[in-house]
Amino acid sequence: MYPIPSWVYDSVVYQIFPDRFFIGKGKTVEDKKDLYLKRGGTIEKWGVPPRKLPGAQHVKVFYGGDLWGIAEKIDYLEELGVNAVYLTPIFLSDTNHKYDTIDYFKIDPQFGGKRAFVHLLKVLHSRNIKLILDGVFNHVGSQHPWFKKARKKDPEYVNRFFLYRDRHRSWFDVGSLPELNVEVEEVREYILKVVQHYLEVGVDGWRLDCGHDLGPLVNLWINMKVKEFSSEKYLVSEIWTYPAGWEMVDGLMNYNFRSLVLSYVNGETDSIGTELERAYRETKNIFGCWNMLDSHDTPRLATTVPVKDLRKLAIVLQFTYPGVPLVYYGTEIGLTGGEDPECRATMEWNREKWDMELFEFYKKMIRFRRTDPGLRFGEFILLKEKPLAFMRKAPHPLQDTIVVVNPEEEKNVVLSLPDGKIMNATPLFDIFTGEKFHVDGGVVKVPVGRRSFRILKPIDLRVGRYRLYKRV
């Protein structure tokens, strides 16, 4: 296990599906139509909801978003407060999702090509925003040169795939996604060469697609290459399991967290504290894991949790549980959408259509998560199961953070705070309401409203020249 890069502890990641974020250089998808039509695609106007088509033809429908457009929205990213961007694949491919790579060393012209990529990287770094790329190394697209040669029985390439008499092995048996034989040395060297190349260009990390399919050893090999380049480069892996046991990478996409939290706020269970505490204790790289609530592979948060007060509870947990919060583009303004492709709708740029109250809530949570020591690296201590309450215990008691999340009716909650340096009479300040609750013998009593939450911070008590924490 390698140390997690230092910048990860302070990060909030923003996920972007490039075709659906923004079209740069003042263009429309109509202006760019030749880029799509000549490669078998179709185009659609911005704002028209995506829909599933027969034969999965929706993967060939393009809206025109590109890397130029992302760079032009840098002020928006800065306003929101995120400091890392994760892009779904950007390499040459004939689909809008680009998980069927044709050439890893070519940025797709549909996204602006190499010039747009270099420009975006420069713009992001000028605002101290990191860039994380999506590495799809479990499989390639059926148009990848290697696979085309293998299909023709070229002996140099046949063993790089899994070919049978009448078919080939592919991801989830999707024929257009032939799986690579990562046990073959030439395949591993090729993958590591791709990883090395973009680290040299300046990207800050990689997200490994289908990390579970790659297996622990390949995850380790890739992270060894990443850390050989720099200990400050980041590797996170897509693994839809309980998060423990994958310490060979810096973290994984914590879908286990997502499932627990959504079940809790939607009333499918009345307690998840034990599960969260166990995962924290057993997952050695928990601080490098992504706290997910939605993504390009799931229904959007506003669809799975339509009641906004309950949705806020999920967001509070996302930003206060150990790990890196990941915000899927548009979730911060209330975009809805079901299963793929509905969850991959275009970003709405008309602010009159935004849920501005939700947007401001996200901004505050992002700012708090990035600056609060307790949330950045504090220990997770479960205080109560019903309603869920926990402490993020930091090195200094005034850096501690206490969180209570109540998806049910109003409750008066009594919490014993397991930090012997939180002094008697210490005020606990609610960062949202401004209310104060005083500690009495290490215990605090807090009313928590229906479908509501508390985020409490200790503050130093001063009476005249007297300071409660003068020697702590």
Curated annotation (Swiss-Prot):
InterPro entries assigned: Cyclomaltodextrinase, Glyco_hydro_13_cat_dom, Glyco_hydro_b, Glycoside_hydrolase_SF, O16G_dom_2
Record EC number: 3.2.1.54
SMART domains named in the record: Aamy
Activity's thermal dependence: Optimum temperature is 85 degrees Celsius with pNP-alpha-D-maltoside as substrate. Remains stable after preincubation for various periods up to 48 hours at temperatures between 50 and 90 degrees Celsius, pH 6.5. The half-life of the enzyme at 95 degrees Celsius is 2 hours.
Classification via CDD domains: AmyAc_CMD
Family: Belongs to the glycosyl hydrolase 13 family.
pH dependence (UniProt free text): Optimum pH is 6.5 with pNP-alpha-D-maltoside as substrate.
Function in brief: Is able to efficiently hydrolyze alpha-, beta-, and gamma-cyclomaltodextrins and linear maltooligosaccharides, to glucose and maltose, by decycling cyclodextrins and liberating glucose from the reducing end of the molecules. Shows a very weak activity on starch and pullulan. Cannot hydrolyze maltose or disaccharides with various types of alpha-links. Is not active against beta-glycosidic bonds of poly-, oligo-, and disaccharides.
Catalytic activity: cyclomaltodextrin + H2O = linear maltodextrin
SUPFAM superfamilies for the chain: (Trans)glycosidases, Glycosyl hydrolase domain
GO molecular function: cyclomaltodextrinase activity
Pfam families recorded: Alpha-amylase
SUBUNIT field: Forms a mixture of homotetramers, homooctamers, and larger homooligomers.
Species annotation: Thermotoga neapolitana
Lineage of source species: Bacteria, Thermotogati, Thermotogota, Thermotogae, Thermotogales
Site positions for Transition state stabilizer: D297
Protein encoded by which gene: aglB
Protein's name in the database: Cyclomaltodextrinase
Record-level GO BP terms: carbohydrate metabolic process
